[in-house]
Amino acid sequence: MHNEKGKNGDEYRHDAFIMPKMRSKLQKPKLYRVLLLDDDYTPMDFVIFVLKSFFKKNFEEAMHIMLSVHQNGVGECGIYNYEVAEMKIIQVRECARQNEHPLQCVMEWK
């Protein structure tokens, strides 16, 4: 026990406030890939617009992903935790709907 004397001679105990060491059991959050799916109707320039607007890709990155969508049927926009991935998908789907494009955006567990 650790004791110190205050100004008026009272003793203060330190050990009452010491927390035992505990191991943290925090787990890394699960990550999800956000993917754009190819269709025959959405213009390539709209896909680039979406990638730049919602995924903060520069033109070269957006072009690379757009070509992957076009050639392979799918392109990875980014890897996020669940909440962020879900929000990105909602944003893309709403933007596509407002612009009357059938662009689909999905997530899959990494």
UniProtKB/Swiss-Prot annotation:
Query: Which organism encodes this protein?
Result: Bartonella henselae (strain ATCC 49882 / DSM 28221 / CCUG 30454 / Houston 1) (Rochalimaea henselae)
Q: Name the NCBIfam families for this protein.
A: PRK00033.1-5
Please give the family membership noted in the entry: Belongs to the ClpS family.
Q: What does this protein do?
A: Involved in the modulation of the specificity of the ClpAP-mediated ATP-dependent protein degradation.
Which BP terms from GO are recorded?
A: protein catabolic process; proteolysis
Q: What is this protein called?
A: ATP-dependent Clp protease adapter protein ClpS
**Which domain of life does this protein belong to?**
Bacteria
| InterPro entries in UniProt | ClpS, ClpS_core, Ribosomal_bL12_C/ClpS-like
Subunit composition and interactions = Binds to the N-terminal domain of the chaperone ClpA.
